[in-house]
Amino acid sequence: MSMLKKYITLSILIMMLGCNKAPKQENQITAADILGNQNYIAISYGGYRQKTRDVQPTMKELKEDMKILAAMGIKILRTYNVQLQQVPNLLKVIKELKLEDPNFEMYVMLGAWIDCKNAWTGKTPNHEIESEQNEGEINRAVTLAKQYPDIVKIIAVGNEAMVNWATNYFVRPNVILKWVNYLQDLKKKGELPKSLWITSSDDFSSWGGGDSSYHTKDLEELIKAVDYISMHTYPMHNSHYNPTFWLVPENEEGLSDEEKIESAMQRSLKFAQKQYDSVSNHMKSLGVNKPIHIGETGWATVSDGHYGVEGSRACDEYKSGRYYELIRDWTIKSNISCFYFEAFDEQWKDARNTMGSENHFGLFKINGEAKYAIWDLVDKGLFDGLTRNGKHITKTYNGDKDALKKEVLVPPTPEEFSIAHQ
């Protein structure tokens, strides 16, 4: 063999060995690789700044948000619909950022919104029939998944679309099952990547973790059809609707205010864990064993309603920050992905009431101020040089924890809660 042939042969062998040892490229990284992986922290994302979604975030605004989230280690985003331009623009922005910086890494759990017939029309919703708009929504999601296979790793069919308290739009599980099966068939045909995971993101009860009325044959088939279960749990909301775990028990009335609050937050974590376990138990009772991740959980920082001064007294930055710390610690240690709700405050959600809790779930305020939950990241300098809406990332309360704590209320006793709700 000539020296040239020997050199070429040796070069090919080295290249082959190098390829075998090289880390996966982004188009090879799959949902199975990133979900439950502590190196891929997840969050729910919406970039709306105004009181209406008629004003879409600009490409520049989306880009500054992505830089902020990447700086804090976020690598998976959950979005909710593809009806509007935000998500297509977001995917363009992520692609641009990847071209600008080979080390930039961000993946998307793409939500396709599902409605029942007459949802949001002023007419009586028909929960037995799906909206004719659903087909177009699914097709848009498919198009984007094909266009950005290196970014879109999951499609979620519906958001809280099966839970009965979503009275404006919920559908029966057979509708979700129909579209999940449709997407799974596209994977089998090679029209979508086989590694693309399909799920639906819904309340723990919709996945069989609560009332037995949800234990239907269609739900059983859905659990078998999805690649993993994406469940929601909200101790904060349940501090009003199912408050037993939240209220200060008689044997703790002698504790300090700080101890009462910490005890309530520990019980809140256990509440979320119990709901997670209930979904897992139902799934296993069907002879199914697949991953379960948390598609949504969060804790608002402001409320003038059920969770405020005259209610369960759950909402403030301290409790929200403590919940964020507790839920992150547990899920990371348990290899559970947690799409924390949410990255930034969005004021369109309760546009008529600036103090409504739905507007205040973000880790950041709209103006870019970092809430108590992530003050430590500001201290570490992770956001140095970054801005939102032209403003540098600073701490709420100017970083004064004593000022923050003046607004923190102790959870009520059962008697106090009862009097407030007479």
How should these model regions be labeled?
Residues 16-18:
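C-terminal motif of bacterial Sec signal peptides marking the signal peptidase cleavage site
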Residues 22-65:
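Boundary/entry segment of secreted carbohydrate-active catalytic domains
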Residues 24-31, 305-326, 330-422:
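Aromatic-rich peripheral "rim/lid" segments of glycoside hydrolase catalytic domains that contact
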Residues 51-69, 134-145, 209-219, 321-326:
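Short, acidic/polar
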Residues 61-85:
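Catalytic domains of carbohydrate-active enzymes, especially glycoside hydrolases
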Residues 77, 155, 229, 294-296, ...:
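Conserved, mostly hydrophobic/aromatic
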Residues 89-196, 294:
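Substrate-binding cleft of extracellular glycoside hydrolase catalytic domains
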Residues 131, 162-294, 300, 304:
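Noncatalytic carbohydrate-binding groove/subsite architecture in carbohydrate-active enzymes
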